């Protein structure tokens, strides 16, 4: 992964108010972490373009933002459902053994017996630990993201090894 690779951190939703503000669905945790990045890359009409964040505030369960040169609801409407990204280099460094969720999605999951369980489709945050949503052609599995269950993660080989019975 290169520092200039894009990481999707949210999606523009719909216009909010009369001055060009836009509701945002944040993929970050906490959701207002997205506001820590002053320039976003917006995928508009299948092309990435930089837009500067002028202001933003929490309006649970959404954020609302004001982006540069978007000053009315008609202009804001053109950006509905556009993806928001930042460059990977703008993300903070992680401690050894920590991962961004975006890096785990799409990885193959096998158990310690070498049985393929599927691929990581998404993650769920729960009160006690995160959960991997692992999908295969046959089924969906919810695998706890704990130190006992997760045996190893290899981002280069794109594989997660888990201590998990294939029948669960």
UniProtKB/Swiss-Prot annotation:
Residues in PRC barrel domain copies: 96-168
GO biological process: ribosomal small subunit biogenesis; rRNA processing
Molecular function terms from GO: ribosome binding
Localization terms from the record: Cytoplasm
Pfam families listed in its UniProt record: PRC_RimM, RimM
InterPro entries according to UniProt: PRC_barrel-like_sf, PRC_RimM, RimM, RimM_N, RimM_N_sf, Transl_B-barrel_sf
SUPFAM superfamilies, A to Z: PRC-barrel domain, Translation proteins
Keywords carried by this UniProt record: Chaperone, Cytoplasm, Ribosome biogenesis, rRNA processing
Chief place where the protein resides: cytoplasm
GO cellular component: cytoplasm; ribosome
Domain comment, as recorded: The PRC barrel domain binds ribosomal protein uS19.
Family: Belongs to the RimM family.
Function: An accessory protein needed during the final step in the assembly of 30S ribosomal subunit, possibly for assembly of the head region. Essential for efficient processing of 16S rRNA. May be needed both before and after RbfA during the maturation of 16S rRNA. It has affinity for free ribosomal 30S subunits but not for 70S ribosomes.
Oligomer and partners: Binds ribosomal protein uS19.
Protein name as it appears in the record: Ribosome maturation factor RimM
Biological source species: Coxiella burnetii (strain Dugway 5J108-111)
